[in-house]
From Swiss-Prot:
An example Gene Ontology CC term for this record: cytoplasm
MF term (GO), any: xanthine phosphoribosyltransferase activity
Protein name as annotated: Xanthine phosphoribosyltransferase
Record's keyword terms, sorted: Cytoplasm, Glycosyltransferase, Purine salvage, Transferase
InterPro entries: PRibTrfase_dom (IPR000836), PRTase-like (IPR029057), Pur/Pyrimidine_PRTase (IPR050118), Xanthine_PRibTrfase (IPR010079)
Reactions this protein catalyses: XMP + diphosphate = xanthine + 5-phospho-alpha-D-ribose 1-diphosphate
Highest classification ranks of the organism: Bacteria, Bacillati, Bacillota, Clostridia, Eubacteriales
Naturally occurring in which organism (per UniProt): Ruminiclostridium cellulolyticum (strain ATCC 35319 / DSM 5812 / JCM 6584 / H10)
Function of the molecule: Converts the preformed base xanthine, a product of nucleic acid breakdown, to xanthosine 5'-monophosphate (XMP), so it can be reused for RNA or DNA synthesis.
EC number(s) stated in the UniProt entry for this protein: 2.4.2.22
Localization terms from the record: Cytoplasm
Example GO biological process: purine ribonucleoside salvage
Transmembrane segment boundaries: none
Residues the record lists as binding xanthine: L20, N27, K156
Length: 190
């Protein structure tokens, strides 16, 4: 998606050779107009899959997922990373390692919100090692729902996550795929 690539080039900051800081428009301060265009693009890519729910993980995927959900006219479910007394104890669980945070979380989704009648679209802001998407896919599998696809805003194509998910047969669509971030310079896969 050219609009997203241009915004990354304009406002993104490379830290080291593997961290891309896009908090000014994607995952801290959110550019809702950009999210609207991303939501339209995800709908264009996955409308034929008859999606019934969108699944993401807290926190950075929620904004994009909610905007995209308007185009599918479906609800959004987000997997929680923390235990809470007000979360139903009857939940699907999965272990997820966060590349950004460098730690493992147990994510959970109440069994009340996913079932075998659903076709799920997973949406997230970043794809690096694929662990978040795999954890969410594991939750979809536990529920008996069908995984319609995985929509990613920014994929780090030089890391193994995208390859891993595609080799498992998942329909992964990334709006921007970064092929390199060496020496502070970004390049994209066309």
């Amino acid at each position: 998606m050219e609009l997203l690539k241009q915004r990354i080039l304009k406002d993104g900051r490379v830290i080291g050779n593997d961290i891309l800081k896009v908090d000014s428009f994607l995952n801290h301060q959110m550019d809702v107009a950009l999210f609207n265009e991303m939501g339209k693009e995800f709908h264009k890519q996955f409308a034929h899959k008859n999606i019934t729910k969108i699944l993401t993980i807290e926190a950075s995927g929620i904004g994009i997922a909610c905007i995209a959900a308007q185009y599918f006219n479906v609800p959004v479910i987000f997997a929680k990373k923390t235990e809470s007394r007000n979360l139903d104890s009857d939940a699907y669980l999965s272990e997820v390692f966060s590349f950004t945070k460098g730690k493992t979380y147990t994510i959970r989704v109440s069994k009340n919100y996913l079932n075998s009648e659903d076709t799920i679209l997973i949406i997230d802001d970043f794809l690096a090692n694929g662990k978040a998407a795999l954890g969410l896919a594991h939750i979809v599998e536990q529920s008996g729902a069908k995984l319609g696809g995985i929509g990613i805003a920014v994929e780090k194509g030089f890391q193994d996550g995208g390859k891993l998910l595609r080799e498992k047969g998942f329909d992964v669509k990334s709006l921007a795929i970064i092929s390199s971030m060496e020496n502070g310079r970004l390049s994209f896969t066309e």
